[in-house]
Curated annotation (Swiss-Prot):
InterPro entries: DHBP_synth_RibB-like_a/b_dom, Sua5-like_dom, TC-AMP_synthase, TC-AMP_synthase_SUA5. Gene3D superfamilies: DHBP synthase. The lineage of its organism: Bacteria, Pseudomonadati, Pseudomonadota, Gammaproteobacteria, Alteromonadales. The gene is tsaC. It catalyses: L-threonine + hydrogencarbonate + ATP = L-threonylcarbamoyladenylate + diphosphate + H2O. Residues 3-188 form the YrdC-like domain. Its EC number is 2.7.7.87. This is Threonylcarbamoyl-AMP synthase. Keywords: ATP-binding, Cytoplasm, Nucleotide-binding, Nucleotidyltransferase, Transferase, tRNA processing. One of its GO terms (cellular component) is cytoplasm. Its main location: cytoplasm. One of its GO terms (biological process) is regulation of translational fidelity. One of its GO terms (molecular function) is ATP binding.
Length: 188
């Protein structure tokens, strides 16, 4: 497992690799959202059922647009989401019909966040697209907040680890349904 800087990991991601990287609150596992093989590998590493869906993180709302059907959202709903970004708010938004079921699971929507974390932003800027994101832990276990645990638990399962500091958040992001405004999970 390579330990690299964000810009050096872009090739690993583009080649279908799964990486671990710091986020606002915990270490995340990520891959290319347009590569079903990479998503399948990530789901196996995490031992997460595909039906649950995943999150996309981005450095800008524009990076998320190819995946979202914003025609199902009002201008006010879009403005509300954008007023919370970048930051620790994840919004569940309707997807375009071409989006892989591996990303959205059994849903007609996907969770998306525009991150304020510098590593996530640099990764997404380098890739010029969002990144699949899920907490670095096995399904049902506590998320990892220490790079050493990534090395211990995932070194033979992932392709790269980006070393870096976690953000200041101690709780996962708040999740809001963009259509209804309902808070699905209280977080930071």
């Amino acid at each position: 497992m390579l330990q690299l800087q964000p810009s050096a990991v872009a090739t690993t991601i583009q080649q279908g690799g799964v990486i671990a990287y710091p986020t606002e609150a915990v270490f995340g596992l990520g891959c290319d959202p347009d590569n079903d093989s990479a998503i399948e590998k990530l789901l196996v590493v995490k031992q997460r059922p595909w039906q649950k869906g995943l999150i996309l993180v981005a450095s800008s709302f524009e990076q998320l647009l190819p995946y979202l059907d914003i025609t199902q959202l009002t201008e006010q709903q879009l403005q509300f989401a954008q007023s919370k970004w970048p930051g620790p708010f994840t919004f569940v938004m309707p997807i375009q019909s071409h989006v892989s079921k591996l990303l959205c699971g059994e849903f007609d929507s996907i969770a998306v966040r525009v991150s304020a974390h510098p590593v996530v932003r640099e990764l997404c800027d380098t890739l010029n697209k969002p990144l699949v994101s899920t907490s670095a832990n096995l399904a049902g276990e506590q998320p990892v907040v220490d790079a050493q645990h990534i090395i211990t638990d995932f070194s033979d399962k992932i392709d790269a680890l980006i070393l870096g500091k976690l953000g200041e958040q101690r709780q996962p992001s708040t999740i809001i349904d963009a259509r209804s405004g309902q808070i699905l999970r209280n977080g930071s």
